[in-house]
Structures are given as structure tokens and as C-alpha cells.
């Protein structure tokens, strides 16, 4: 009888520790999101019109010459002041024809993420340069091993559906080696979709060579690109980041999806009123969307408005804010 009870207890423990089947998991990739609507239709229309005004009358400066060529060929206007301005018709046409059914792929197809509709996915993000040790609570520089460990953790957590490079490999001084080893450590740790940044446009061809090897060839990579480029292509307010734009162009040519990031701070690099910060971030990301579609119509691009608030008494960024799309469809 004692042996039987022990066997029952062991079976219960085994059942409790076993992974849940997909249909019982409380958080699943692509669950339909809720609705948060801080603005009514009139308010959203005002912001939309302000975005169009900003793109048409202010525009963005410091595009690389290749970007100027792509954008002016698509219908943007280069002013005598060097700023690229975007006619309303060009903006609205791009919105209408942009790819709205983007799927970010994992190396394992079960990790594919369809981004259409109100589907929500959670993952890591950021580029932390320090780590707090669990033992001793001491800060230290983050390392390549930390990135790999984070990828391994994300790979087995049900509520993390993709891996954005969460840390910087501070133990690698050479930027090319850092970029290549970051890709390798992320892909070695997870089969989920991976997001990475690159330092120089000249490094992209080396990154593509590695990705082709991991994928099993160039054709296999282009059929299932499992890494995207997290690209801060603007320096707010309303300036293109020249080298980041060149990196973006190179990755697009290599078949990589792009996450367009605008990270202005309300009260510092964006207007202090939240509505103004939203206008600027939306205008900047729309300029990026036009840029991407001017290079490759329909190329997969994620609209990554990322507005922060500057704490004026410390000049720090309050980065614990929600990013909400203007249609009230999903919270990230």
C-alpha cells in the first residue's frame, strides 16, 4: 500500500511538472488583444492630419544619398534645405499598399508569428549594457554568454514568443565580431524569431553569410528569414540616422524583415505634450515605411513607434510606458 501511494504521489508530481498542452497554456502566441481607446475618432483624425502636415511641411533631414534617390523616385520632394518632404498622396498611397500581413518566422515553424489583426506577441527587447548578478546583487558588464543564456531562457518560457537581443556583448571590443557573435549566440540559444541590430552597413554581408550557413543556403534563408533588423533609422526629432538607414537598405536587399524604431522622448527630443510626441513618432515611422516600400514594395516592415517621456527634473527617460497604436487595437 505504501508503495502504491508513493507511486501515486510520483505520478501527480510528474503531471504537475509536465508542460501544458498548447490549448491549456494561459498565454499563447497570437492571442487576440483587447481594446484601449484613449482617443475618439475626432482625436485620432486630428493626430492623423497633424502627421500628414508634419511630413509634408517639415519632413526629415540627413538621409543618405541612396535614401534621397529612393525617396525622390517614389515621389518625395528634396528641398533646398536638404530635407525630404512627403506629399500627402505619397503617404496615403504607401499606407494603402504596405504589407499588412507580416509573418515573422522562427527557425522552428511552430514559433512563426502572424502579426495581422489584433494578435499579440510578447518578447524580450532593449540593449542593456549592465547585468545585476543574482548572487551579491552587483552590477557588471553584460557579456556574450549572458545573451546566449537569455536566449536559452526565452526559448523555454511559454510567455515569450520572440527574442530581441536583450543585452550588448561588452566583452567583445570589435564591432564586427560583436555583431556576428550576437547573431550566433541568439540563434544558438533559441529557435524563435530573433531581432538584432548591426553597427555598420559594411558588416551586413558578413551577417548574411552567417545566416545563409545557419539556414542551409541563401535560398533557404530567403524562403524563411528567421532574423529581423531592429533599426533605429531616425534620430528624433525628424532626422534620419544616416548609417542606420544604410544598414536597413543592405538588410532589405538581403531579404531581412525590418522593425522601424522611433524612440523620441517627450520633453527632450519630442514635444512635451503626449499628443505631440505621438504625432512625431508616427510621422517618423511613416517616413520609414515609405523608405522601405520605395526600396522594395511590400517588404515586411513593422511599425515601431516607441515614444518615451523625459523626466524633466532628472533628464532620465521614463521607459515603463505602454506603447499603444492609435486605432486602439492592441497594447504592446
What kind of feature is each model-predicted range?
Residues 61-69, 80-82, 161, 220-224, ...:
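Flexible, glycine/charged-enriched surface loops at secondary-structure junctions
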Amino acid at each position: 500500500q505504501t508503495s502504491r501511494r508513493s507511486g501515486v504521489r510520483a505520478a501527480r508530481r510528474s503531471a504537475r511538472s509536465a508542460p501544458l498542452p498548447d490549448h491549456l497554456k494561459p498565454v499563447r502566441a497570437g492571442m487576440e488583444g483587447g481594446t484601449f481607446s484613449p482617443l475618439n475618432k475626432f482625436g485620432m483624425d486630428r493626430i492623423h492630419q497633424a502627421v500628414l502636415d508634419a511630413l509634408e511641411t517639415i519632413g526629415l533631414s540627413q538621409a543618405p544619398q541612396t535614401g534621397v534617390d529612393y525617396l525622390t523616385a517614389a515621389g518625395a520632394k528634396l528641398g533646398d534645405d536638404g530635407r525630404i518632404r512627403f506629399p500627402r498622396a505619397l503617404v496615403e498611397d504607401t499606407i494603402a499598399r504596405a504589407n499588412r500581413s507580416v509573418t515573422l518566422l522562427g527557425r522552428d515553424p511552430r514559433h512563426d508569428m502572424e502579426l495581422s489583426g489584433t494578435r499579440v506577441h510578447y518578447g524580450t527587447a532593449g540593449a542593456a549594457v549592465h547585468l545585476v548578478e543574482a548572487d551579491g546583487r552587483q552590477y557588471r558588464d553584460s557579456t556574450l554568454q549572458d545573451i546566449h543564456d537569455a536566449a536559452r531562457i526565452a526559448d523555454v518560457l511559454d510567455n515569450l514568443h520572440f527574442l530581441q537581443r536583450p543585452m550588448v556583448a561588452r566583452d567583445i571590443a570589435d564591432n564586427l565580431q560583436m555583431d556576428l557573435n550576437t547573431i550566433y549566440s541568439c540563434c544558438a540559444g533559441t529557435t524563435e524569431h530573433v531581432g538584432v541590430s548591426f553597427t555598420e552597413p559594411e558588416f551586413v554581408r558578413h551577417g548574411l553569410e552567417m545566416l545563409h550557413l545557419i539556414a542551409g543556403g541563401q535560398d533557404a534563408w530567403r524562403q524563411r528569414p528567421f532574423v529581423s533588423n531592429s533599426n533605429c533609422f531616425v534620430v528624433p526629432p525628424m532626422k534620419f540616422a544616416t548609417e542606420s538607414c544604410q544598414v536597413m537598405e543592405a538588410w532589405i536587399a538581403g531579404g531581412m524583415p525590418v522593425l522601424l524604431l522611433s524612440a523620441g522622448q517627450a520633453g527632450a527630443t519630442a514635444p512635451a505634450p503626449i499628443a505631440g510626441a505621438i504625432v512625431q513618432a508616427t510621422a517618423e515611422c511613416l517616413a520609414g515605411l515609405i523608405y522601405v516600400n520605395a526600396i522594395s514594395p511590400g517588404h515586411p516592415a513593422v511599425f515601431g513607434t516607441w515614444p518615451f517621456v523625459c523626466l524633466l527634473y532628472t533628464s532620465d527617460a521614463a521607459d515603463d510606458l505602454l506603447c499603444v497604436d492609435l486605432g486602439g487595437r492592441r497594447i504592446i
